[in-house]
Amino acid sequence: MRGGQTGIDEATTKKKVVAPLRLLELFSGTGSIGRAFEAQGWEVISVDTDPKAQATFRQDISRWDCASLLGKKIDVIWASPPCTNYSALRKSTEEDRLDSDKLVRRTLEIAETLGNPPMFIENPWTGKLKTRGLLDHLRLNLVDYCTYGMPYRKRTAIWTNTAWIPSCPLCKHDCASSRNGKHTARAQQGGPGPSFSQRELYRIPAELCDEIAEFCGRG
């Protein structure tokens, strides 16, 4: 066989190296979303201040320089900004809420720096983030965690710039976790009924994470 032909054959038989899709998980916390994406072959880059989060970057997002990622294509951003100062149950001040607003704005700045890839921002629906006007340009979806396998409802808002729509309708107190029109558990620490640790309450249902990861994987 001629040398030139051999070179062509070798070139055509070489396997193409395909770079993995990448998720940037901001305020990664329990890593619920990251695990779902990793299970589908994605590379996950995470940012959080909590050492328990075992994030790629253990840093305050307000001080984190995302320029180190400019050489890498980020395919999806997920963010779960702290909800404490937005909580209706907490006696937070307007100054507290303004501090939290800065983190949400920083999230949007990072997304813009990275080319505004598909993005999801999650926060409890009972909180006040929805009243701050920061995410009005994004599609708002509501989910109830009980319809995705959790024992409590915990209605949650997910803002996105994608076409994703939850597959499960909102609960009408008729889900598998309801008895006689009431949920058997509440998303709370202490009090009557089952009690959950703070880390457990911060978890995002695996079924919901898988659904979003599958949607993003379809491109």
Q: In which residue ranges do the predicted regions lie?
A:
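Conserved active-site and SAM-binding loop architecture
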Residues: M1-G219
